[in-house]
Amino acid sequence: MGFLTLVLHKLSICPFSFLLFILYASAVPLATTNTRPSYHITPEKKWMNDPQRPFFLGDEWHLYYLYNSNFDSSNPGSGGTEWYHITSTDMVHWTRRGVVLEKYKPNPPSGIILGDIETGSAVVDINNTAGFGRSAVVAIVTQMADGVQQQSLFYSTDNGYSFIPYEGNPIMPNPSPSAKPAFRDPKIFWDDKEGRWVMSLAEGDKIGFYTSIDLKTWAYVSEFKPENAGVDLGILECPDLYQIDLDGDSTKRTWILALGANGYRYNRTTGTAYWTGKWDGNGFTATESFPQWMDDGPDFYATVSWENPDDRYGSRYAIAWMNSWDYAASLPYYADFAGQDSLVREVKLKTINSSPTLVSIPIGGYGEIFASPKSVSDKTITTDPASASLPSGMEQGAYIIRATISKNDGDKGNEVRFVIKSDGTFSTTVGYDFVHSQAFLVRDSDGSATDSMAAGPKQAYDTVRTAPDPTGGSTVKLVIYVDWNSVEIFVNDGEAVLSGLIYPNQEANGIQVVSDIGSLTLVSFSYAACDSIDYLGKA
């Protein structure tokens, strides 16, 4: 979703929300640290938001993200977005290639400016169905001008390094331009069984499905409208329809419909909801009425997933924008850039408690960027930080913690707490509650930079976030990825996940492991630092 769409997004929820957005977005404070994340995708400068689904072509991965080169911290909702291109051979180290779809450019031959470039999707047209050449890259994106959203097509014959606007744009005009309804975020894929392209399109409180044989002309076939969508989930965005094998069994191939939503009823900010179900070539039928959530943290939105070339249906990859529209316009951004993506994750569908559930862990390539670990084991931890006897030399800003904690017979503790990014006054706490079988993230006192946020966004930011552990038990395994201003917590091999931004004070890198009361057993603990890998160099 582009920045101009954000204004309409707020307005479509309620007029009062729009007024609050104007008030909250009047100025964005700068953070108290100027350290760029070490191993997350960030823009070289200015603003980034939604990632666009990557594809593999020419021996490299291609990822685009929404980019605002005119980002102004005093007026963060202005400027519009375009597509910025980065490439990688391992999805860990990335190279910046520059803007490939520019905003506010006249479309030939009419010369009409159709708007900025917002979220969409790109495919490799291996069968030349569109007529632009075999393996041309075809991108279908939302453009918005004067509040009217419509879909345009751009194509590339140089592996996605540059794009040409299609002369027939817009290929999908808004059906009711005077009313200016939501009509955005096209996600397209090739339906092998039907031999045609399928598009899912966000249309307010529902998802519309369309089909095409040439990527240019699209026919409406059906819609999916979640129960109480407008009340429970708000405006729906960034749909993603795909197949994946349940428990790695090809006879249990399952369809997933994921989308960006507001978790009002579920005490959530914006996040990624999903349903399992069936696609019959024309429509999606969900197995359950209510969604599951891909990540229980506050900052995992506009998620895209894509095929694993080595295991097409056994697993997928996924990445998301680490932010929330509940406070995106009020965060204390850095002086030279704003925004980051999550880690790239491998996603599988597993049966947990009789329910098909998406689980995710960071891809293996991240294991190569950390130093040799420092570790301890078999410690009894209490409310005294000294009880854990943690290794010395843990002062880096970016690192990974791996820990296994047990509540054994005789242990009186209920929670293990990892107090990170501490300067003695401010800190972030992540941990696990054995009584309620859930992980948690507490960041209401992460640093002084967020204290100046307006009341509404501040409340959304400060709310404690929890992730239910579906299997529970007396032992839990946590893997915690900490970067300079983010934390991603993976519980029991990704059966539960929490992702969130944090804004620590300068050089606040203290770490403690304690219990809430009594004692718990720290079965194992390791810490490994990550130096900046300069993963986003210029080409």
Predicted regions and their residues:
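Beta-rich carbohydrate-recognition and catalytic domains
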Residues: 28-185, 190-232, 245-296, 320-378, ...
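A positional/structural detector of protein chain ends, strongest at the extreme C-terminus
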Residues: 1-4, 539
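Beta-rich accessory regions
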Residues: 248-250, 278-290, 294-301, 306-539
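Bacterial N-terminal signal peptides that target proteins for export
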Residues: 3-14
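N-terminal signal peptide
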Residues: 2, 16-31
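Beta-strand-rich binding-surface signature
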Residues: 185, 238, 477
